[in-house]
Swiss-Prot record:
InterPro entries assigned to the protein according to its UniProt record, in alphabetical order: Acetaldehyde_dehydrogenase, Acetylaldehyde_DH_C, NAD(P)-bd_dom_sf, Semialdehyde_DH_NAD-bd
Protein name per UniProt: Acetaldehyde dehydrogenase 1/2
Family matches, as SMART domains: Semialdhyde_dh
Lineage of the species this protein comes from: Bacteria, Pseudomonadati, Pseudomonadota, Alphaproteobacteria, Sphingomonadales
SUPFAM superfamilies in the record: Glyceraldehyde-3-phosphate dehydrogenase-like, C-terminal domain (SSF55347), NAD(P)-binding Rossmann-fold domains (SSF51735)
Amino acid sequence: MSQKVKAAIIGSGNIGTDLMIKMIKYPQNMELAAVVGIDPASEGLAMARERGIATTHEGIEGLKKLPDYAEIGVVFDATSAYAHKVHDEALRADGKLVVDLTPAAIGPFTIPPVNMDEHLDATNVNMVTCGGQATIPIVAAVSQVATVHYAEIVASVSSRSAGPGTRANIDEFTRTTASAIEKVGGAAQGKAIIILNPAEPPMIMRDTVFTLSEGADEEAIRASVAAMVAKVQAYVPGYRLKQEVQFERFGDNNKLKIPGRGEFTGIKTSVFLEVEGAGDYLPSYSGNLDIMTAAAKATGELLAQRIIERRAAA
């Protein structure tokens, strides 16, 4: 009997299909057993069938009818926040672990290199947003060596890589990401901005992270950021620093005012990132989508490893 944990993907659009290709190309602890959609003509479902993976276009009810359903341990949801609430209730009732790629955020915000170890026993984990996956590791890196009073991220993504869901949920993106900057990144106050870049040919994802901190020197911050970038690169090879980390000091004679928090003295750190997609299914400029699917897969692998360990101990 295979030691691998069977997994399913709900959602056969761009995100679900890219995740499917990653799971097939880079197998570790999981075996993809099913892909679920609602459109029988979906390209994602057709690609899954071509690869010998069970499919259904009848949504979660169709998944539950598949012969392997009882053996599935991990389910990825790449649909919508509204649909996820229904899926989550049904899946957890059947003992499945759920990785949520929607904005529903029923489970805890999860950034693999930052706080995955805290959520290995969670039954539902949320992948925040693409901007969150790219930038919160950097905020957390600064927080590990300093007290971060304020963190602001600016995510610039190709307009062509932003589908109707992203466009309809810009406000939700900024709120969710800002909340996770605080809850996961460790900043006392967080702010997020997203820019849809219309440039042609499309530009890869670019992110800027600003932090205002005290209690650490520049070298400690620089080293912590470099270590965190290496951790993210382990599952997103196209994630990299665009240039050297920049620092600016504010002392008693040139205090910086933080809206809502008063005057600040300490170090302003500016980190410039770019994220190039792996090109598994989505084009390489869609680094914003690639980092979501890569982070979801990395999270699923850790959850699956936990299941394998429990089986061995039983």
